[in-house]
Amino acid sequence: MAKDIKFSEEARRSMLRGVDTLANAVKVTLGPKGRNVVLEKKFGSPLITNDGVTIAKEIELEDAFENMGAKLVAEVASKTNDVAGDGTTTATVLAQAMIREGLKNVTAGANPMGLRKGIEKAVTAAIEELKTISKPIEGKSSIAQVAAISAADEEVGQLIAEAMERVGNDGVITLEESKGFTTELDVVEGMQFDRGYASPYMITDSDKMEAVLDNPYILITDKKISNIQEILPVLEQVVQQGKPLLIIAEDVEGEALATLVVNKLRGTFNVVAVKAPGFGDRRKAMLEDIAILTGGEVITEELGRDLKSATVESLGRAGKVVVTKENTTVVEGIGNTEQIAARIGQIRAQLEETTSEFDREKLQERLAKLAGGVAVIKVGAATETELKERKLRIEDALNSTRAAVEEGIVAGGGTSLMNVYTKVASIVAEGDEATGINIVLRALEEPVRQIAINAGLEGSVVVERLKGEKVGVGFNAATGEWVNMLESGIVDPAKVTRSALQNAASVAAMFLTTEAVVADKPEPNAPAMPDMGGMGMGGMGGMM
């Protein structure tokens, strides 16, 4: 296929049009008085959202060069979303400002490589200063503030704060669509995995269709149990102790399952068998997690152990186990706290190393199960359109809160970017490097300016006044007042602000150093089919 090539000024101008189109659509959502954007969906109702990355991903432009510019900025939003989970609109606004200012200077004859150096120096200094002024997040109220600002909803802030308090900062918090109108929190404490009882005859509560075991022993193995003789020695020891037993194995079938069910029905002893969770290497890791949590051992041939040699000492213990048709929940495992902490550390290390999104998700789940539990926020709304929009906002708020726990908080409303202004302005540089620093300085003003514009005010007036205010004092666009942002609970996670600035600068620097752009030439329209006049009904008279 033939290619279309544009060079230097013409190439950058074409791409800038795409950058502006996308950024102008995204930036109307910034701040407490930001508007929504409606996205057409091929099927179902349109999606109404104020989430920057969702809007950016939907935009496709007809002109190939403009589309490349738009896609570059969409990449800024997407990367910021991947790293911090929020701040995508801020990242887009920063990228647009840096690209526009940079292009003015390149057109005026500045060397793009010098500008790039200056931009990188300025951003490094800004990030160092952000780290200095960030404050660690403390207590439930701070978490609620971060979440409420991100979701623009205080009720959501309280829900997320409560969820994090219940399951810990490492706990898994998932979102589900509720059948009702209200948004609720449901917490599953302890370790839960998605395997239910091997036979419905093992239930202890026929109303709820679940088996509840109090202070049970837990036999953990990666083997298939089909012969009762294999586990008879350990069964006899458990019966003597007068305690119930949970068996977690690859499978329990045939004669072994039948014998267990018969003894359960006769009331000889209380036993429930479930299949081991996961598959392959992940199954081994999860069984090991359960063993560490309950203070037991995994009976596996890899360690030279067989089921006949198992004793009650090698079994795990827990305060309570609840088994339903689909899930097993182990509560209050009596494992050694030091070993559990070591295991959590090991999983954290794996989390940092992995590049796979799927592996990261699974490791996060394992970490949460060891750390304390899973919280489910059930999102409710009156219509499907509102439900989708609300779910996206809560997802952003959740990511924002996690980022705040990791790296602390800074003043919100774009104030923190203006608070690093003096530090960046003090960098000593000459020529094009100094121009690059000025490009970043101009971009640092842009989020505050846009928040003010969206609130119906004159952006430049707000920016100029903010430059003269003390660190931490900013403009509350929701009320139109000048307040101490941290004290008023208007905060942003430092990680979100840092990621937005870093990613915007990275793409802007690449954009400015672009000298040629190559795109596919649009194909000419295929000629229309020839007229088939002779095939009309009149022309087919001879066929009658």
Swiss-Prot record:
> Pfam families given for it?
Cpn60_TCP1 (PF00118)
| Key words of the record | ATP-binding, Chaperone, Cytoplasm, Isomerase, Nucleotide-binding
> Which enzyme class?
isomerase
Q: Which reaction does it catalyse?
A: ATP + H2O + a folded polypeptide = ADP + phosphate + an unfolded polypeptide
Localization per record: Cytoplasm
What does the similarity note say? Belongs to the chaperonin (HSP60) family.
**Protein name, please?**
Chaperonin GroEL
Lineage runs:
Bacteria, Bacillati, Bacillota, Bacilli, Bacillales
Q: Which gene encodes it?
A: groEL
